[in-house]
Amino acid sequence: MRINRRSMLLGGLGTALAASPTLAQDITFFRINTGGTAGTYFPIGGLIANAISNPPGSRTCADGGSCGVPGVVATAVASNGSVANVSAIAGGSAQSGFTQSDVAYWAFNASGIYEGRPKVDVLRAIANLYPETFHLVARKGAGIKTIKDLKGKRVSLDEPGSGTLVDARLILAAYGLTEKDMKAEYLKSQQAADKLKDNALDAFFSVSGWPLGAIAELAATTGIDLVPIDGPGAEKLLKQYSFFSADQIPDGAYKGVAGVKTVGVHALWTTSSKQNDELIYKIAVALWNPATRKLLDSGHAKGREIKLDSATQGLGIPLHAGAEKFYKEQGLLK
């Protein structure tokens, strides 16, 4: 609640300042579209909005005030997530938003769930924030130890129209499989978990940070195995699709379940190429200020995974020119 209230206060302050003719010209409002209020995107967006904001009249960073961009008032706004955020950025109703790297890649290239649509060629990355991990969850005793073992099994690939479904198909193809090799179903993670618990499903794909509640409950009650996504199939996948990256789920992430190597996508902070280069450069500087590091580390578990050394990895789309300038100065890009 503290994050949301702070964002609202910043928004209210911006309104008050805008009423002042002497200060209004110094204000830049910057909207960050996030996700649902119960998810991870929204609180992370609140932290970042606080970090990059420094409204007119505020103390400077050197004087103990915010180390955000002077004149910027940023707000984190709840949304329907990645696809909605891409649309908002493309349409100009949001200056930025959080998007899964696979969704960003498909939008930029008019592929995947965007096949047949115009390319969203204005989409640009500010930073890779943190990983979102692929889980292939199998019912204990189902005899599924590798992806090849999915043949003939009852497997959920996630709901129609989802990015997870498209990614699951890509993963299967990398191992020489298709949906026709199994009894495929198309369910959300919670629905799939319920069916697996009732012995009506053998395995399902899910993308999330770990631990995911639905999977943690299965581990504690029904018993599960995590199936690795590794070896030559994973290597082929990583080589072919730049939005994937190597990932792992450690031992103990789920009670009594051995960790595995897997693949993941990334939560990206994205914007439009039409946003001012100098503004995005200053926002990147503020994002990676040491003061922001403290805010991210203390504000949310996923905040601790937002690190400068991985900011340019697994993007799948071009960086914004302003962000690219910053990362070159930091030696992350040539």
Model-identified regions with their sequence ranges:
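Pocket-flanking alpha-helical
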Residues: A62-R117, Q190-K195, L201, W210-A219, ...
